[in-house]
Amino acid sequence: MSPKTETKASVGFKAGVKDYKLTYYTPDYETKSTDILAAFRVTPQPGVPPEEAGAAVAAESSTGTWTTVWTDGLTSLDRYKGRCYHIEPVAGEESQFIAYVAYPLDLFEEGSVTNMFTSIVGNVFGFKALRALRLEDLRIPPAYSKTFQGPPHGIQVERDKLNKYGRPLLGCTIKPKLGLSAKNYGRAVYECLRGGLDFTKDDENVNSQPFMRWRDRFLFCAEAIYKSQAETGEIKGHYLNATAGTCEEMIKRAVFARELGVPIVMHDYLTGGFTANTTLAHYCRDNGLLLHIHRAMHAVIDRQKNHGMHFRVLAKALRMSGGDHIHAGTVVGKLEGERDITLGFVDLLRDDFIEKDRSRGIYFTQDWVSMPGVLPVASGGIHVWHMPALTEIFGDDSVLQFGGGTLGQPWGNAPRAVANRVALEACVQARNEGRDLAREGNEIIREASKWSPELAAACEVWKEIKFEFAEWIPCNQ
């Protein structure tokens, strides 16, 4: 190629590795009400300036690539590019900072969590200029959230369907989670429901294995639901796990559940995927089914504090994709989490409007407008002695899910369920009378156990149970 030709071809175009901060670091940018805002915890490689690292995150999660390309001239980068508009240090961490990035709304397909995450938490997390990257929070503007259906029904509609008000709902995961035949599984469900629980649950591992095929399980669980309803006069449910290897098979299982007339099905939304979850949520709204969500695999994504994604982001994504319940940790028990941080994302699940509050890990004010709320599910190593704390911490709009805490005392499933129901009713009554559950919780349980032999037996079984692990970092189920 002649020098003259090179000169003509290079007019307005310079190849090579470019500095991202020249285009994508815009500290003077004023965010728009329609922008999706992200807060990233960035750990750059040694020698990479914060401005360059933050700009690289904005570029690689939006319109940028590592070099200038001639097709940049065929569109408006100023209209479509992500912008790193603010950088702040992380207290106590010399090599980390929070980079705030604004994304124009037109970068994302309407009603698609899958597409949103493909951009914001896609290839940028493997970028060489970064040692680690964690998405701490997202601000979803109403202009985008209104393109999602959200939860199939929401908290108020669920209470109306169940005719249950003024208290948390009670659940139990059937154990052992694998190995029971369908008939024995259904018997365990029946005993728990007739003892006073509102729900029982398939473990997230239970799909359709050789020892118990899904159709058999659905039939025996439906029988258990109807029999317990007839005996107690209360509406009951069992979270029938519809998670499957294909979306078509998942919907087939949900259709069968609807034909049986049961009130609720279940999905593992992270292992199943957001496309499958949104598909199931739409089916559930159209067909009157509640949808319980388990978060299996979340700790792979959210456990490391420097890399991955905080669960509050996964919680927001679930509310958009759709689910009426989701597991959210306990604050107490074997999967104890930080109280303020946990309640921060619990409020993001339940409330319509949540103010920015960094002490609770909430980086942005979030307005869900009219999107229905999601019931948080507290589960993992909890038992009757935890009931006062759980009632006080989570309030009425929650599901308290006792697995081993229901099935692990010696009198049988129904008396164990009675113990949990009595403990809950005692705590709710004491709270309504103005008693302090945080200070008087143990005394409230002891008083109730005097007239409930089932609760007295449970109190004796669980009185010495503690979860203490040296050098162990807790995660939430």
Swiss-Prot record:
Residues binding substrate: N123, T173, K177, R295, H327, S379
Residues that bind Mg(2+): K201, D203, E204
Underlying gene: rbcL
Family: Belongs to the RuBisCO large chain family. Type I subfamily.
UniProt protein name: Ribulose bisphosphate carboxylase large chain
A Gene Ontology term for the protein's cellular component: chloroplast
Modified residues (N6-carboxylysine): K201
PTM sites of type N6,N6,N6-trimethyllysine: K14
Superkingdom of this protein's organism: Eukaryota
PTM annotation (N-acetylproline): residues: P3
Complexes and interactors: Heterohexadecamer of 8 large chains and 8 small chains; disulfide-linked. The disulfide link is formed within the large subunit homodimers.
Species of origin: Persea americana
Cell compartment(s), UniProt: Plastid, Chloroplast
PTM description: The disulfide bond which can form in the large chain dimeric partners within the hexadecamer appears to be associated with oxidative stress and protein turnover.
One Gene Ontology biological process: reductive pentose-phosphate cycle
Keywords: Acetylation, Calvin cycle, Carbon dioxide fixation, Chloroplast, Disulfide bond, Lyase, Magnesium, Metal-binding, Methylation, Monooxygenase, Oxidoreductase, Photorespiration, Photosynthesis, Plastid
Single GO MF descriptor: ribulose-bisphosphate carboxylase activity
Note: The basic functional RuBisCO is composed of a large chain homodimer in a 'head-to-tail' conformation. In form I RuBisCO this homodimer is arranged in a barrel-like tetramer with the small subunits forming a tetrameric 'cap' on each end of the 'barrel'.
Propeptide: 1-2
UniProt catalytic activity: 2 (2R)-3-phosphoglycerate + 2 H(+) = D-ribulose 1,5-bisphosphate + CO2 + H2O; D-ribulose 1,5-bisphosphate + O2 = 2-phosphoglycolate + (2R)-3-phosphoglycerate + 2 H(+)
Residues the record marks as site: Transition state stabilizer: K334
Entry note: cofactor: Binds 1 Mg(2+) ion per subunit.
Annotated catalytic residues: K175 (proton acceptor), H294 (proton acceptor)
Claim: Oxidoreductase is one of the keywords in the record: yes
EC number(s) recorded for this UniProt protein: 4.1.1.39
InterPro entries to which the protein is assigned, alphabetical: RuBisCO, RuBisCo_large_chain_AS, RuBisCO_lsu_C, RuBisCO_lsu_C_sf, RuBisCO_lsu_fd_N, RuBisCO_lsu_N_sf, RuBisCO_lsuI
Pfam families named in the record: RuBisCO_large, RuBisCO_large_N
Cofactor: Mg(2+)
